[in-house]
Amino acid sequence: MIVVIAALLPPEVHACSTFLVGKGASVDGSLFVTHSDDGEGDPDARLSFIPAADHAPGAFRDVWPDLEDNPRFVGTARGETYLPGRGVPSDAKGTEPIGKIPQVNHTYAYTEGNYGIMNEKQLSIGESTCSGRFVANAKGSGGEALFCVNELSRIAMERCATARCAIRTMGDLATEHGFYGASGSFEGGSETLLIADTSEGWVMHFVPYPETNSAVWVAKRVPDDEVTVVMNMFTIRSVNLKDPENYMYSDNIIDVAVKHGLWDPSGKDGVFDFTKAYSDGEYAHKYYSGRRAWGAFRLINPGIELDPNYGDLRIDDPYPWSMKPAKPVSASDLFAWHRDWYQDTPFDMSKGVAAGPWGSPDRFNGCDAEVSIPGSFERSIALHRTTYTHVLQTRGWLPDAIGGITWYGPHAAHGTCFVPVPAGIKKLPAALTIGNATLVDRDSQWWAHRYVHNLAQMKYAYAVEDIRAAQAMWENEGAELVAAVDAKFRGGAASPEAVDVALGMFEAHVDKVRAAWWRLGDVIMANYADGFVSKAKTGAPVGYPAWWLEAAGWRQGPEPIPPPKTGGSKIFREGGSLEWGARVRRAGSASLASAFRV
């Protein structure tokens, strides 16, 4: 029997929004996988490039613990980003492995953030933490499990060129050596990965199984002409155990559910439902996952009406697993979807008192009082505390080096600019490898976007238009760069020298965007400092909107100056008259400015 003690559950763990677009659902035959890394506290915002390597027979690979705060790793095993002195004290202690497994002869080059992102073969991964009915702890931390999903994704990057290889490799390691989730509770104790190569895309769910130091897992193929989403909760329902083309799973998937009373094979519970059996539902609050799923599907196909309300997301199954889009999907569509805060719906987060006078969609956590004041804000796909978002694009008709594109957006998606990073990169632009949350760094791409996004809160409804204009300009330039490079390599393989020239063009683009964003911060400061909107923008000052003044208690503020008992005060000015002072008194404090216009 599984017992959940709600009082012990954390209010929120890392929570990520993801999309997967089949090649038949995109504008040009690309597959897309996305991921928003929605961290909090002291995130490690750095990207790292891990080069390809050959390994001696009999070598072993260290297995690293699940560390996501800064620094997530210190050492030489995972690229130059994590060398001591790069964003951490030069005397920082190196990260200690929690185990080892046999190494393979050759490992592929790849980029990573908190998880493996894309390798040189265009294998691509996105992640979304989920709740589960079992909890396991890591080896050395009160448990025996060796693998977190972060490490599994890295090993898949190192060893696999296809999604099926990645699923089988990660699944076998998890069941053989044990799997543990992102938190030591049922809330956030399981995981989902979205995995794509140049041909197909899959969704894979992991559940720890501490009873035998193992895991339960399942994977389902996304139809080529459809789009699926995962928003911090399992989505796979029925599993066809006789359809290896579309399903992969651990051998214990049914036995564990039956043993622990999670599914009755007699027929009482109906068809086996993986989510109903193994999910522990939404975490943080009701609608935390389901509302985002509803919001995403309304973007994918606005013509299909779905109900934003439901009873129990785990039981009710109110939304489709995947959906045909209303129109073919592009990278820019996915940028926009990750910037969604339910605009033009009853849940629009830029509306109402919580949005403030300037319509900010961002909501911060409550203070200590939240433990005694029940309540929640809506959670949208766009989130102010996102560490980074990536939109991964795979294209099998081009050489891997430039066919795979990581559209990388540091910090919150609604404030970032997505820049293209090709799969064949040999060294990351330095600006993407720097990001310490405790120190503003003008060499850091992440800090440029974080800085501007926070400045925009001064007058968000106005400043966001400046940000959108910059996003459109620079993301269009990035798309033009990708198209120009594509044209050079469409015929197939190219010389290493030509590839190096192309990669240098991408690095130069990243640096141009970083410089432009720091300039944008200066523009926003000049336009909206001290509560004003500069005359260069509007030609007139802009004060608080009337609806917000009413909500904020403007009418209950200090009273106007009381009228004199016997006429006005005798106030003289050169060439003036006695009645001027009386005019000021009669006007009242709210009209002083007009009274003093002489």
Where are the predicted features?
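Accessory, solvent-exposed terminal regions and/or long lumenal/extracellular loops of proteins
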Residues: 290-375, 379-381, 460-472, 476-488
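Bacterial N-terminal signal peptides
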Residues: 1-7
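Substrate-recognition/cap regions that form aromatic- and gly/pro-loop-enriched pockets
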Residues: 358-494
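Short, charged, surface-exposed loops that flank catalytic or proteolytic processing sites
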Residues: 159-167
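Second-shell loop/turn segments in exported
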Residues: 138-142, 151-160
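Histidine-centered catalytic/metal-binding microenvironments
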Residues: 468-597
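A contiguous strand-loop segment
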Residues: 16-148, 169-329
